[in-house]
Amino acid sequence: MTIHKAVKRITASEIRSRKGQEPIVSLTAYQAYSARIADPYCDLLLVGDSVGMVVHGFETTLPVSLDMMILHGQAVMRGSKRALVVVDMPFGSYEESPEQAFSNASRILAETGCSAVKLEGGVYIAETIDFLCKRGIPVMSHVGLTPQAVNRFGGFKTQGRNESNWQQIEADAAAIEKAGAFAVVVEGVVEPLAVKLTQMLSIPTIGIGASSQCDGQILVMEDMLGYGTWVPKFVRRYGVLEQEMEKAIKSYADDVKSRTFPSDEEIYKLKQKSG
């Protein structure tokens, strides 16, 4: 009898213990197939509300619903075995009260099987993070450029360009650490501030457009694979998959029009009559 050894999934506490150790490798994932490919190489897969912009074509993350996040969270859990899967709580699903946040976060964990959620914000959301953590829901937070606050920021703008603005971001990071978050995404802040946050916090910082000195890095998978024409400054492209996809689709279209697809080897034929 063949015995299959179960793969142990990384936990939130294990991610927290990686502070100052080997950098944490993270990517976004929205589908089972991409999660399956990324899983052996990533410590953490984030089912980000960026799915609204990347997959569904929204201009911001604001229209993303809780049901959408659960659907994509289920897909990523089915595709992965090893990485810690964290699901974003979408705009409007946690800001009203800690009780609202717990109701929706517990639904995410129960219906997807994931092990943690991510909330944007700092000081103002610390009470909610504390409420969730004390009730058994691991929380990763997100400071700096927080996409759900796009209207308040007036767009997707780098934070901390003036040192006079650092104090609020530092206060946000300290508040979510005290509240019990196991890690924090630091997005779109100037490099010296990202380094300072990494040094002052006892929990891992996971950078995106921040600093190589963060405790880990995360990118939108489609960005680093080479989909789309606009490339943010902080993205390094490791592939050109959009061009490859277009090339393949064009070849398919040409073959269909020329009737060279399907070929004899790609169609089913009648069985030969015996006798």
Curated annotation (Swiss-Prot):
Pathway the protein acts in: Cofactor biosynthesis; (R)-pantothenate biosynthesis; (R)-pantoate from 3-methyl-2-oxobutanoate: step 1/2
The reaction(s) this protein catalyses: 3-methyl-2-oxobutanoate + (6R)-5,10-methylene-5,6,7,8-tetrahydrofolate + H2O = 2-dehydropantoate + (6S)-5,6,7,8-tetrahydrofolate
Signal sequence region: none
Residues reported in the UniProt entry to bind 3-methyl-2-oxobutanoate: D49, S50, D88, K118
Active-site residues (renumbered): E187
Enzyme class: transferase
Details of cofactor binding: Binds 1 Mg(2+) ion per subunit.
Localization of this protein: Cytoplasm
Cofactor: Mg(2+)
SUPFAM superfamilies: Phosphoenolpyruvate/pyruvate domain
Principal localisation: cytoplasm
Protein name (Swiss-Prot/TrEMBL): 3-methyl-2-oxobutanoate hydroxymethyltransferase
Biological source species: Bartonella henselae (strain ATCC 49882 / DSM 28221 / CCUG 30454 / Houston 1)
Gene from which this protein is expressed: panB
